[in-house]
């Protein structure tokens, strides 16, 4: 764990009790688990995501999540990336094809501890765990989207 990630989460101002409590959980986990950026930590790990607004800010980009069978904002595993904003932008590009993205805020937009049920992925069982999710607010300068089937 880098000091930068810890400080970014520590300086985040929660907007509600859920974010306040999730922030405390994340800070404690980061302090106790140096491998928090890696999905190899099977109890919990950091993920990065983004709410993405259209160029005119009248629409939001959502993706269909096959595991949960529901719509969600774009995001995924940090996979060791210490810059969570960069990880979120990478995930948005991978999932939507949008490349021209820019942050609309000076830091984290929201925090969430998300429970993940055990499931099969690419023929391998993934045990139940928690995603310590950091969300950013982005605007896309692109109009076209592409589908990522998985």
Residue locations for each model-derived region?
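N-terminal domain-onset segments
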Residues: 1-17, 21
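Short charge-dense sequence patches
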Residues: 1-3, 35-45, 86, 122-132
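Phosphate-binding glycine-rich loops and adjacent basic patches that engage nucleotide phosphates
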Residues: 10-13, 47-58, 132-144
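Acidic, metal-coordinating catalytic segment for phosphate/diphosphate chemistry
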Residues: 14-49
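Glycine-rich, flexible loop/turn motifs
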Residues: 33, 42, 67-69, 74, ...
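N-terminal strand-loop-strand
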Residues: 37-73
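Unchanged
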Residues: 79-150
């Amino acid at each position: 764990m880098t000091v930068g990630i810890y400080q970014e989460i520590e300086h985040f101002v929660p907007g509600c009790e859920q974010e306040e409590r999730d922030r405390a959980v994340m800070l404690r986990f980061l302090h106790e688990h140096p491998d928090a950026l890696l999905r190899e930590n099977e109890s919990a790990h950091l993920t990065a995501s983004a709410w993405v607004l259209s160029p005119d800010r009248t629409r939001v980009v959502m993706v269909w999540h096959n595991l949960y069978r529901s719509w969600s904002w774009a995001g995924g595993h940090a996979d060791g990336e210490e810059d969570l904003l960069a990880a979120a932008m990478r995930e948005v590009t991978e999932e939507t094809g949008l490349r021209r993205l820019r942050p609309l805020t000076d830091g984290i937009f929201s925090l969430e501890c998300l429970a993940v049920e055990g499931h099969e992925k690419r023929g391998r069982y993934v045990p139940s765990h928690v995603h310590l999710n950091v969300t950013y607010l982005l605007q896309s300068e692109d109009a076209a989207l592409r589908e990522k089937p998985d």
